[in-house]
Amino acid sequence: MKTKCVRHSDAQGMVEYALILLLIAIASLLILQLSGISVRDVYCRVASGFGANACGGTAYCKDDFSNLNGWKVSAGPATGWKIVNGQMCADSYGTLANKCSMAGMPSNDYVAEIDGAKLNQGNGYGLFFRATDSGLGMNGYAFQYDPGLSGVVIRKWVNGAEINPALAFKSMPGTDWYGAAHKLSVKVQGNTFIGMLDGVPVLTATDSTYPSGGTALRTWDSTQVCMDSFGVNPIAP
């Protein structure tokens, strides 16, 4: 009589391999969540790399800078902002409010962004968010690309004045701040704000002073900067 031998080693190896893959997947998800990146964000970036528009949605506000009709100078010289070759360019200090977002949006939570921003001179530029114009200046917050501080920073503003200390600051020594185009964006959700540079989270701040508000562009000192486009989008689920 022949005896049959059942081999368990191959099956056990497959189970162990599957468990390892599961642990790697769980760890990756936790890292993404801690970094403020959703799985959908990753999928959208990969799909976009292959030319797909799988994550298209309706922007709350957007501007390709074909003209200045959607903007209002809130501070600084009226001639400080110009459309040059399809880009929004600033050659001075000032604040330029986005009329669409200031008029109100479907949600107080959003992602505001400027794309293709190239700083040629000066101490930096930034994005106001959850902002309103008090008549004395902006109330709200600003996320700033700030070579003057050699870093990026999120500040609270009251009646046109920035409040110290900053809500969040990240030093970036050794960064070449000039001549390269960047995407500056901020994810605004509840009382938590995540500042991103080229799609990568770089700092997080929390504050509950301003629960709602629109967006604006900001420059200071002798800044010269041009940017390709602007948008305020819903947060991906």
Describe the role of every protein-language-model region:
Residues 92-161, 236:
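Secretory/extracellular carbohydrate-interaction modules
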